[in-house]
Amino acid sequence: MPHNVVLTGRPGIGKTTVCLKVRNVLEEEGYTVGGIYCPEIREGGRRIGFEIVDLTEGDRYLLAREGASGPRVGRYGVFVDNLERAAESIERAVKRTDVVIVDEVGPMELKSNAFVDAVRRAADAHTPAIFVVHERSRHPVVVDLREERPDVVRFRVTLSNRDELSDRILEHVLEWLEER
């Protein structure tokens, strides 16, 4: 039975919301969940960047911000050093938690080789992982997760399925956790 879950979908459709709903229920059931997610930073109703949130420790640090130095993705400069911290968070979660969430594996996050390596190791580990991946990226690690790995169940988040999708993912992850 596949132990990895991959979510895709257009920006703003609710992929992070689905992940966080799954996390909340798993924790209510007594499971530990670690990893990262990358919410927007808004100022005056306008998106000005993104941060990284460590789900285990609760730490927050910048992923990207308008006008920042560092590798560029659109109008944002990416903080590669912080992605290396995110990679460490993922590695820690693989070793210490029941389920790992990596939201997102997208153009900004892929600027760090350490992050890419951590994603690969998380996918290869025996710990179930939920990955949010960029829908159109051709990066090898994204293509592998989105299209090629046999140990992945894939879902595309849409307006019509996003409300019940967390239940389907939970059912899959809980079944896997109970079988191991």
Curated annotation (Swiss-Prot):
Entry EC no(s): 3.6.1.15
Record-listed ATP binding positions: 9-16, 99-106
Family: Belongs to the THEP1 NTPase family.
SUPFAM superfamilies membership: P-loop containing nucleoside triphosphate hydrolases
InterPro entries: AAA+_ATPase, Nuc-triphosphatase_THEP1, P-loop_NTPase
Keyword Hydrolase: yes
Catalysis performed (reactions): a ribonucleoside 5'-triphosphate + H2O = a ribonucleoside 5'-diphosphate + phosphate + H(+)
The protein's name: Nucleoside-triphosphatase THEP1
Enzyme class: hydrolase
Listed HAMAP family: NTPase_1 (MF_00796)
UniProt xrefs under Pfam families: NTPase_1
Key words of the record: ATP-binding, Hydrolase, Nucleotide-binding
GO molecular function: ATP binding; ATP hydrolysis activity
Function comment: Has nucleotide phosphatase activity towards ATP, GTP, CTP, TTP and UTP. May hydrolyze nucleoside diphosphates with lower efficiency.
Species: Methanopyrus kandleri (strain AV19 / DSM 6324 / JCM 9639 / NBRC 100938)
